[in-house]
A protein has these predicted regions:
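Macrodomain-like recognition of ADP-ribose-binding/processing modules
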Residues: 1-259
């Protein structure tokens, strides 16, 4: 199957699953098809699809990621011992584990085509990720607390695993509690990674987007926490993944990188 054929197969399956399929799909260009497919994946509840869907979905997502271009963490240059800075799309990074800035449901973002990292990671990992997260949360029986960490497979992403953590939500003035909770996100992800023998972890800028944590303060907390952890745990590579130019500028300034 071509990518176009896979995309239309998946759209038709997801419409039929929702009992909303028309006799024939309306004409759509490639970008419209991609938006419709992503929207349907985003709103899909965690339930087992059939084997044909998974086979086509996996082939489709892996090709989409390959076309975006995969970056191997082993090719990155450190900014200091054990620490790396990378500007790019975390869903294209090949490493031990990437960190997802999750919400307390831990099921991913249900808003169609939302631009948050939670949406992107669940979209390109595939429906299996939401299924695994749902199993974890069903067993747990209560919302995920702020500052903790959970580990899942990464499925169709280039990384081996995804670490999920819920950062603090800032609704007013930043507090010491907020800062401690953010530090806990980094520490608990690294502790869990070390426990599982994961050798490289890529952190997004936790809480700085939809959760409104001040970017510069968050970066200082992230770097300080990671440096402290690496003093006693030198076997893990830590990658600070930044997507926005302003975050890249902040991290470069803190690390003293020119240009």
């Amino acid at each position: 199957m071509t990518q176009s054929e896979r995309r239309l197969f998946l759209i038709k399956y997801l419409f039929e699953e929702r009992e909303a399929c028309r006799a024939s799909l309306p004409p759509m260009n490639e970008e419209e098809q991609k938006r419709v497919l992503r929207s349907l994946l985003n709103i899909r509840e965690p339930k087992e699809p059939n084997a044909d869907f998974l086979r086509v979905q996996d082939a489709y997502l892996q090709e989409e990621i390959r076309e975006k271009g995969i970056t191997d963490a082993n090719t990155l240059e450190p900014v200091e011992d054990g620490i790396y800075l990378w500007h790019g799309d975390i869903t294209t990074l090949k490493c031990g584990a990437i960190v997802n800035a999750a919400n307390s449901r831990l099921l991913g973002c249900f808003a169609p085509c939302h631009l948050c990292i939670d949406n992107a990671i669940h979209t390109f990992a595939g429906v299996q990720l939401r299924l695994e997260c749902n199993r974890i949360m069903t067993v747990q029986g209560y919302p995920e607390p702020t500052g903790k960490a959970k580990l899942t497979k990464a499925y169709n992403l280039p990384s081996e695993y995804v670490l999920h953590t819920v950062g603090p939500i800032i609704g007013g003035k930043l507090t010491e509690k907020d800062e401690k909770e953010l530090a806990s996100c980094y520490t608990n992800c690294l502790v869990l990674a070390a426990k599982k023998g994961i050798k490289s972890v890529a952190f997004c800028c936790i809480s700085t987007g939809e959760f409104h944590f001040p970017n510069e303060t968050a970066a200082h907390i992230a770097i300080k926490t990671v440096r402290n952890f690496l003093k006693a745990n030198k076997d893990i590579k830590v990658i600070f993944n930044v997507f926005l130019q302003k975050d890249l500028d902040i991290y470069r300034r803190i690390f003293g990188i020119d240009g």
